[in-house]
């Protein structure tokens, strides 16, 4: 297969994994587009994206326009004469003139099985909803939000111990192989595009810190799903004794309770059992303010008086 001249557009580490795969392939990455450097860390020092750092380490030209809606930026991109543009978590809207510029258009690596979970947080929303599988879709981009024709899909079962962090890692391994396979099919003309079924589409909204507050009136199963979805960000939490306590790991208990939602049923080094709107949730790992995440056994050693049976959590809001 003849090598393709590729423009790569992406920003975070997930995108950098895909760029590395392209660099390692026989294709030519002729330019990289990434978000402008942003202030980061305590010193708010301007910091390059992982994609920019990787590109510069391989002497690949880097472009960082604040927008691709203006003609000078569009002309600059067109002058590169790329065969195709590969977009992975770039973070900028591509107008139609940009989508139509490369000979083979623009393709996107998306972290869900489209048309389910279009949008910004597909990995997290799959966990949040209790989905049994996720995957990667390689899509021909159009002007809609993740609405383009699907070129290739891979599938990944979601395990009970998966979190957003672990799924992110698994999809970051699966995605690059799918991308290379799709590029080969496009170059050879052997890929058959599949339209998305709009009746199956839904939207993966961004997560918010407010959403991560545990609502004990929900079912234990839903709360377990949320804790996994919000790990490592924004991390589920509840308020107690005037403090915000983060929850990193839970499991659904086999015990039952008629106590009011948010009531501690039992507290031992194996876990803290909390009554919910349906079932009992066992807290396994938590984080006190200013501290590192700890097992419940260590939490009880430090603050056992906070978590005695019959105590109500989030009681300030009830």
Swiss-Prot record:
Q: Which catalysed reactions does the entry list for this protein?
A: L-methionyl-tRNA(fMet) + (6R)-10-formyltetrahydrofolate = N-formyl-L-methionyl-tRNA(fMet) + (6S)-5,6,7,8-tetrahydrofolate + H(+)
User: Which sequence ranges form a coiled-coil region, renumbered to this chain?
Assistant: none
Identify the keywords attached in UniProt to this record, alphabetized.
Protein biosynthesis, Transferase
Residues the record lists as binding (6S)-5,6,7,8-tetrahydrofolate: 112-115
Give any Gene Ontology cellular component.
cytosol
A Pfam match is Formyl_trans_C
An example of a Gene Ontology BP annotation on this entry? conversion of methionyl-tRNA to N-formyl-methionyl-tRNA
EC number(s): the record gives 2.1.2.9
Gene Ontology terms, MF aspect: methionyl-tRNA formyltransferase activity
Task: Tell me the protein family, please.
Answer: Belongs to the Fmt family.
Q: Which NCBIfam families match?
A: fmt
From the Swiss-Prot or TrEMBL record, give the protein name: Methionyl-tRNA formyltransferase
């Amino acid at each position: 297969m003849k090598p393709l001249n590729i423009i790569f557009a992406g920003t975070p580490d997930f995108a950098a994994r895909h760029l590395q795969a392209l660099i390692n392939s026989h294709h030519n990455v002729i330019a990289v587009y990434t978000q402008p450097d942003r202030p980061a860390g305590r010193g708010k020092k301007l910091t390059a994206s992982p994609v920019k750092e990787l590109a510069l380490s391989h002497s690949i030209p880097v472009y960082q326009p604040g927008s691709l809606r203006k003609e000078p930026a569009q002309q600059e991109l067109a002058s590169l004469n790329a065969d195709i543009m590969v977009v992975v978590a770039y973070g900028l809207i591509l107008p139609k003139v940009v989508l139509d510029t490369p000979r083979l258009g623009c393709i996107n690596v998306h972290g869900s099985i489209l048309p389910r979970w279009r949008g910004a947080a597909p990995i997290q929303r799959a966990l949040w909803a209790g989905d049994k599988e996720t995957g990667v879709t390689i899509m021909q981009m159009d002007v809609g939000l993740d609405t383009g024709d699907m070129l290739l899909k891979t599938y990944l079962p979601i395990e009970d111990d998966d979190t957003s962090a672990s799924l992110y890692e698994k999809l970051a391994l699966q995605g690059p192989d799918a991308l290379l396979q799709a590029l080969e099919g496009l170059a050879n003309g052997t890929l058959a595009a599949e339209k998305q079924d709009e009746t199956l589409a839904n939207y993966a909204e961004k997560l918010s810190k407010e959403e991560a507050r545990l609502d004990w009136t929900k079912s234990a199963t839903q709360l377990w799903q949320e804790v996994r979805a919000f790990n490592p960000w924004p991390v589920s939490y509840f308020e107690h004794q005037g403090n915000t306590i983060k929850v990193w790991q839970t499991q659904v208990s086999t015990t039952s309770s008629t106590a009011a939602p948010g009531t501690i049923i039992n507290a031992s080094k194996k876990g803290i059992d909390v009554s919910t709107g349906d079932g009992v949730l066992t807290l396994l790992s938590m984080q006190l303010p200013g501290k590192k995440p700890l097992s419940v056994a260590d939490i009880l050693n430090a603050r056992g008086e906070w978590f005695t049976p019959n105590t109500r959590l989030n009681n300030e809001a009830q």
